[in-house]
């Protein structure tokens, strides 16, 4: 009985060690000059948006801007879609806040977010 429990524990440990790690949903930018902005911090680590993300206004077409049917000006080069973005500064504009009519006391505020696509800007602190 003890031998089978030890064998099962060893097999489980071996499976856990050999399994590839799961992908992190949030990868912080390198350096200390990046700022966390709460729940949106993980979304700022790349230019692509999730198709399931909540948007304030729905798209008029079946595909989002930059998709296969978009005009050439809106299409991004594949390299640009996978770039990491370094958040340099976040300047909230509290005078441009308005209450949303959702009945939960939610406010939508505007902010200036300064981004950089250069790795050197992210490393300099």
UniProtKB/Swiss-Prot annotation:
Propeptide at which positions? 56-125
List where in the cell it is found.
Answer: Secreted
Question: What does it do?
Answer: May be involved in the regulation of feeding, neuroendocrine system, memory, learning and in the afferent pain pathway.
By which gene is this protein encoded? Answer: NPB
Answer whether the UniProt record assigns the keyword Membrane to this protein: no
Species per Swiss-Prot/TrEMBL record: Homo sapiens (Human)
Question: Do the record's keywords include Signal?
Answer: yes
| Protein name (record) | Neuropeptide B
Record's Gene Ontology CC terms? Answer: extracellular region
Tissue expression, per UniProt? Widely expressed in the central nervous system. High levels are found in substantia nigra, hypothalamus, hippocampus, spinal cord, placenta and fetal brain; lower levels are found in testis, uterus and ovary. Also detected at high levels in colorectal adenocarcinoma.
Which family does the record claim for this protein?
Belongs to the neuropeptide B/W family.
UniProt KW keywords: Cleavage on pair of basic residues, Neuropeptide, Secreted, Signal
Identify the main location: secreted
Q: Which GO terms describe its biological process?
A: feeding behavior; G protein-coupled receptor signaling pathway; neuropeptide signaling pathway
Q: Which InterPro entries match?
A: Neuropept_B_pre, Neuropept_BW_pre
* Gene Ontology molecular function: any one: G protein-coupled receptor binding
The leader peptide range reads: 1-24
Cited Pfam families: NPBW (PF15180)
Disordered as annotated region, ranges: 54-73
């Amino acid at each position: 009985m003890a031998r089978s429990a030890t064998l099962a524990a060893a097999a489980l440990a071996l499976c856990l060690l050999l399994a590839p790690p799961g992908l992190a949903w949030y990868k912080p930018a390198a350096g200390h000059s990046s700022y966390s902005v709460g729940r949106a911090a993980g979304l700022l680590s790349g230019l692509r948006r999730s198709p399931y993300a909540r948007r304030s206004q729905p798209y008029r077409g079946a595909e989002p801007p930059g998709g296969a049917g978009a005009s050439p000006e809106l299409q991004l080069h594949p390299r640009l879609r996978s770039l990491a973005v370094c958040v340099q500064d976040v300047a909230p504009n509290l005078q441009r806040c308005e209450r949303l009519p959702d009945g939960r006391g939610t406010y939508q505020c505007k902010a200036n977010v300064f981004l950089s696509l250069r790795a050197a800007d992210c490393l300099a602190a």
